[in-house]
Amino acid sequence: MAAEVDSRPRGLPGGGASLGAAREHVQAVTRNYITHPRITYRTVCSVNGPLVVLDQVKFAQYAEIVNFTLPNGTQRSGQVLEVSGTKAIVQVFEGTSGIDAQKTTCEFTGDILRTPVSEDMLGRVFNGSGKPIDKGPVVMAEDFLDINGQPINPHDRIYPEEMIETGISPIDVMNSIARGQKIPIFSAAGLPHNEIAAQICRQAGLVKKSKAVLDYHDDNFAIVFAAMGVNMETARFFKSDFEQNGTMGNVCLFLNLANDPTIERIITPRLALTTAEFLAYQCEKHVLVILTDMSSYAEALREVSAAREEVPGRRGFPGYMYTDLATIYERAGRVEGRGGSITQIPILTMPNDDITHPIPDLTGFITEGQIYVDRQLHNRQIYPPINVLPSLSRLMKSAIGEGMTRKDHGDVSNQLYACYAIGKDVQAMKAVVGEEALTSEDLLYLEFLQKFEKKFINQGPYEKRSVFESLDLGWKLLRTFPKEMLKRIPQNIIDEFFSREGAPQDTEADTAL
């Protein structure tokens, strides 16, 4: 029997050409780039800021990685942001300077951006794209992970309940940090936020409870540090600080400096968090992630948005910045069945000291509180210049109290807040009416204000106070007032702790002053 031959002209609807085209589109979805050779393109049609537009592209996929080869042989990588018909818009991580529209070749890899991860990354220094810059060998990868992370089932998240003791009194007593929390440092240009972050890295540890079964050993602790758009001095400060304290073996550094490409800053925090997730959930380490400076990251986001000619939001930042920041900050926490945790401390510098700026404003919505670094305290030579009034820790309530720190912790914190706030009001009133018009109670609050800033907030960069020493110091300051004025503390707590005999560690706090 003779085979039937399609006599219809090729190219017409229903002909073999359209069937072939349909088959080709179906295969494009499941295309195997190992058995099929990749297509190399020389179809760069325009370059706009950090973006390259390619034409006559087949099988392009969203978020696919593209490798560029420049005329001089230099290799660069980019990511597909948008596909429309045969055109693809690619964001180049290393910048677009030197890309020749005529001679640059590019190749689509068919894969998303993955980073090699290994426990051997601790003690190493990488650039903003994850390549080693410490003259060491390439990382022998245990796995290649998607830099956008794996979504965590909210039902499997564990509520953070173990307090981290930082050794810094205003943080430990009034803004306690729980393991697995995300809490940013709101700072501004010229303030010592780097020194505070370094001090937290040096001194951080759990408040050791009795009969604990958790692993408190130093080997179980790791730090992942990601710098975006920082100067060489800041990078050197952190690196030398880690080396001097002997913790460099437990630190993994990702450095995107001010003279590195701006667009690279978009992937730097994601590389750092992917590494942190591997160390926390596969190696079961307790990881502290420090991201500085999130303002540089947001400006890189604005640059890409402007190049794509998207409708700008407040101050020119893209409307999706809230969502984008959330994809970074939400990668903190604890997961049921895993021994590790990720605690995030992002640092951001507020432009013009403005807390209503979109970057700190949106960050405050997503994160679980903030630590506010104040310029007026810094100008008065107080270190760390942490203003406790705008500072907040939303998870503090579950990390303190009897069995975790001490039963008077919450009440002492509330009373210190109340007295300091009233003291600030009295100070403002004194500037208007003069000291003679103040009552004796007002003068007590004024005295407390000065003592609080000089003795409680102020401490040395290498001075570590335990949470119990800080609480006893708080009681020492509260004894400025008669018992009747301490309205935020229950009577049974006052009876137990107010008298000097009731606080056995108070003599140690005296000598510390």
From Swiss-Prot:
NCBIfam families to which the protein is assigned, alphabetical: PRK04196.1, V-ATPase_V1_B
Record's subunit section: V-ATPase is a heteromultimeric enzyme made up of two complexes: the ATP-hydrolytic V1 complex and the proton translocation V0 complex. The V1 complex consists of three catalytic AB heterodimers that form a heterohexamer, three peripheral stalks each consisting of EG heterodimers, one central rotor including subunits D and F, and the regulatory subunits C and H. The proton translocation complex V0 consists of the proton transport subunit a, a ring of proteolipid subunits c9c'', rotary subunit d, subunits e and f, and the accessory subunits ATP6AP1/Ac45 and ATP6AP2/PRR.
Coiled coil segments of this chain: none
Principal subcellular localisation of the protein: membrane
Record keywords, A-Z: ATP-binding, Cell membrane, Hydrogen ion transport, Ion transport, Membrane, Nucleotide-binding, Transport
Subcellular location: Apical cell membrane; Basolateral cell membrane
Job of this protein: Non-catalytic subunit of the V1 complex of vacuolar(H+)-ATPase (V-ATPase), a multisubunit enzyme composed of a peripheral complex (V1) that hydrolyzes ATP and a membrane integral complex (V0) that translocates protons. V-ATPase is responsible for acidifying and maintaining the pH of intracellular compartments and in some cell types, is targeted to the plasma membrane, where it is responsible for acidifying the extracellular environment. Essential for the proper assembly and activity of V-ATPase.
Source organism superkingdom: Eukaryota
Keyword Cell membrane: yes
SUPFAM superfamilies: P-loop containing nucleoside triphosphate hydrolases
Signal peptide: none
InterPro entries from the UniProt entry: ATP-synt_VA_C, ATPase_a/bsu_AS, ATPase_F1/V1/A1_a/bsu_N, ATPase_F1/V1/A1_a/bsu_nucl-bd, ATPase_V1-cplx_bsu, P-loop_NTPase, V-ATPase_su_B/beta
Gene Ontology BP terms: ATP metabolic process; inner ear morphogenesis; ossification; proton transmembrane transport; regulation of pH; vacuolar acidification; vacuolar proton-transporting V-type ATPase complex assembly
S-S pairs: none
Gene Ontology cellular-component terms listed: apical plasma membrane; basolateral plasma membrane; cytoplasm; lateral plasma membrane; microvillus; proton-transporting V-type ATPase, V1 domain; vacuolar proton-transporting V-type ATPase complex
Family under the similarity heading: Belongs to the ATPase alpha/beta chains family.
Tissues in which the protein is found: Kidney cortex and medulla.
Protein name: V-type proton ATPase subunit B, kidney isoform
Sequence positions that bind ATP: 394
One Pfam assignment: ATP-synt_VA_C
Molecular function terms, GO-annotated: ATP binding; proton transmembrane transporter activity; proton-transporting ATPase activity, rotational mechanism
Keyword DNA-binding tagged: no
Motif PDZ-binding location, chain numbering: 510-513
Notes on the domains: The PDZ-binding motif mediates interactions with NHERF1 and SCL4A7.
PANTHER family: V-TYPE PROTON ATPASE SUBUNIT B, V-TYPE PROTON ATPASE SUBUNIT B, KIDNEY ISOFORM
